[in-house]
Amino acid sequence: MIIFPAIDILDGKCVRLFKGDFNKTTVYENDPVKTAKDFESQGSKYLHIVDLDGAKNPLNRQSEIIKRIALETELNIQTGGGIRSEEQIKDYLDNGVSSVIVGSMAAVEPEKAKGWIKTFGKERIVLSLDVNIVNNEPFVAAYGWQGSSGKNLFDLINGYTLQGLRVLCTDISRDGALQGPNIDLYKNVLNKCPGVELQASGGVAGLNDLIKLKETGVHGVIVGKALYERKFTLREALSI
């Protein structure tokens, strides 16, 4: 299981949101490049970066900071936030980013996302399908979690009909809350969507959460606030 330490960039700083709410922001570091290098020095080979400015307003993307991180580290970087075009994806991939995270377009315009997967390869595209649980059913959010696609998570994933499809799934109600991950959600995804390469995100509060996630068979897990709040060290997480 891959551990992805997370950097969320807002106004050029490293922040965490509480349950996806832009009005509930905590600034942890002023320099995302330094933070990325710190993660690398602790042994990480992977990094997850979310451009919250881009997610909120695609015209205000923080792509130059992200490209600097790719240039100045050896990290395998996956990044997204406000990705709306093939040109944006190509720009990141041409500048050292390993894979690009497609969020709203994956839910709202799946045919366009399928085209990008065909163009760049499934190993270079990660679909970020973030959900709100309504009556025990996961529905996919869109547009920086400020809207809903109205689509069921399992139906949407299976609509891609691709073995090895890379999917990052966040339970929004757990994100930044340190309340533990939604283990049942990830078990259900792996059960109902065979062949998916799943990354879990949201709620990790302790090393035991990582152990539980590993037991589900997820391919990777995003760890953010727990690291910034020093619930455990990155070295400890990488040892699991």
Swiss-Prot record:
Catalyzed reactions: 1-(5-phospho-beta-D-ribosyl)-5-[(5-phospho-beta-D-ribosylamino)methylideneamino]imidazole-4-carboxamide = 5-[(5-phospho-1-deoxy-D-ribulos-1-ylimino)methylamino]-1-(5-phospho-beta-D-ribosyl)imidazole-4-carboxamide
Gene Ontology CC: one annotated term: cytoplasm
Pathway(s) this gene product operates in, as recorded in its UniProt entry: Amino-acid biosynthesis; L-histidine biosynthesis; L-histidine from 5-phospho-alpha-D-ribose 1-diphosphate: step 4/9
Gene3D superfamilies: Aldolase class I
Pfam families: His_biosynth
Broad class of where this protein is predominantly found: cytoplasm
Annotated localization: Cytoplasm
CDD domains from the UniProt entry: HisA
GO MF annotations, alphabetized: 1-(5-phosphoribosyl)-5-[(5-phosphoribosylamino)methylideneamino]imidazole-4-carboxamide isomerase activity
EC number from the UniProt entry: 5.3.1.16
Entry-linked InterPro entries: Aldolase_TIM, His_biosynth, HisA_bact_arch, Isoase_HisA-like, Isoase_HisA-like_bact, RibuloseP-bd_barrel
Domain of life of the native organism: Bacteria
Keywords: Amino-acid biosynthesis, Cytoplasm, Histidine biosynthesis, Isomerase
EC top class, as a word: isomerase
Active site: D8, D130
GO BP, one annotated term: L-tryptophan biosynthetic process
Xref: HAMAP family: HisA (MF_01014)
Family the entry assigns: Belongs to the HisA/HisF family.
The name this protein goes by in its record: 1-(5-phosphoribosyl)-5-[(5-phosphoribosylamino)methylideneamino] imidazole-4-carboxamide isomerase
Source organism of the structure: Elusimicrobium minutum (strain Pei191)
Lineage, highest ranks first: Bacteria, Pseudomonadati, Elusimicrobiota, Elusimicrobia, Elusimicrobiales
